[in-house]
Amino acid sequence: MSDSKSSASTSEDRLYGSAPSHDVPKRKTRTHHLQAMKAEGERWAMLTAYDYSSARIFEEAGIPVLLVGDSAANVVYGYETTVPVTIDELLPLVRGVVRGAPHALVVADLPFGSYESSPEQALASATRFMKEGLAHAVKLEGGERVAPQIAAITAAGIPVMAHVGFTPQSVNSLGGFRVQGRGDAAEQLVADAIAVQEAGAFSVVMEMVPAEIAGQVTRKLTIPTVGIGAGVECDAQVLVWQDMAGYTSGKTAKFVKRFGNVGDELRSAAAAYATEVRAGTFPAEEHSF
């Protein structure tokens, strides 16, 4: 590198901060790695991510799988449910996450209305996320009813993560946020999980499912199960990162554990910044050129 290029790089680092160093050797996470981890009894964590900066942090924390969820409808765009969010709204988020976490397996949610009509519609939507979003896999909700869609997508060489139990896109038809798979419904949940595996899914999310049933499904399937409100026997767990880190305020679901208080920290930092600006103490001499 020439002295001029080195000097320019140093100047940019001073202005904007240098890129993070990745001291720990990492491999690119792929679907067969997750399959091997299930075989070895090794659990793994998945988080949602919606931008470059959070994805970078989660990769540094050792999270192997990141989901650009349609939950962006709630935490990014402020919709009340996941139903309104579109492919065009999700694609830029996927691209940012892929760039921020080059070693993670990045899964993109197919939003409501983008796959239900036919296998052809599902494949077209999944292809957009792979070509335009650079995602590594897609996720869609439903069991037996979407098995043809899963089969069509996987036949085209696109990995699919399935999602059974409570499916947020169907919140209106399910009568609200309710635990699924209780009583007589347990048999259908098991059938749904088997159907998505047979259709070619590489893993399946189980949301708001009784822990006992989720454990039975996990033992029955050869693909990894990912729990969210489905007990500890699943092969992996997933949470929305804003819930996990305490970024969101107000009441959270029973299955959420807050591992931090990011919201309080950010609020305090913003308030301190505003106070110093009003007082004329920021920027100080050391922050000026």
UniProtKB/Swiss-Prot annotation:
GO terms for biological process: pantothenate biosynthetic process. Residues 1-33 are annotated as: Disordered. GO terms for molecular function: 3-methyl-2-oxobutanoate hydroxymethyltransferase activity; magnesium ion binding. The active site is at E207. Keywords: Cytoplasm, Magnesium, Metal-binding, Pantothenate biosynthesis, Transferase. One of its GO terms (cellular component) is cytoplasm. It catalyses: 3-methyl-2-oxobutanoate + (6R)-5,10-methylene-5,6,7,8-tetrahydrofolate + H2O = 2-dehydropantoate + (6S)-5,6,7,8-tetrahydrofolate. Its cofactor is Mg(2+). Its main location: cytoplasm. Binds 1 Mg(2+) ion per subunit. InterPro entries: Pantoate_hydroxy_MeTrfase, Pyrv/PenolPyrv_kinase-like_dom, Pyrv_kinase-like_dom_sf. It is found in: Cytoplasm. Belongs to the PanB family. Homodecamer; pentamer of dimers. Catalyzes the reversible reaction in which hydroxymethyl group from 5,10-methylenetetrahydrofolate is transferred onto alpha-ketoisovalerate to form ketopantoate. This is 3-methyl-2-oxobutanoate hydroxymethyltransferase. It comes from Rhodococcus jostii (strain RHA1). The lineage of its organism: Bacteria, Bacillati, Actinomycetota, Actinomycetes, Mycobacteriales.
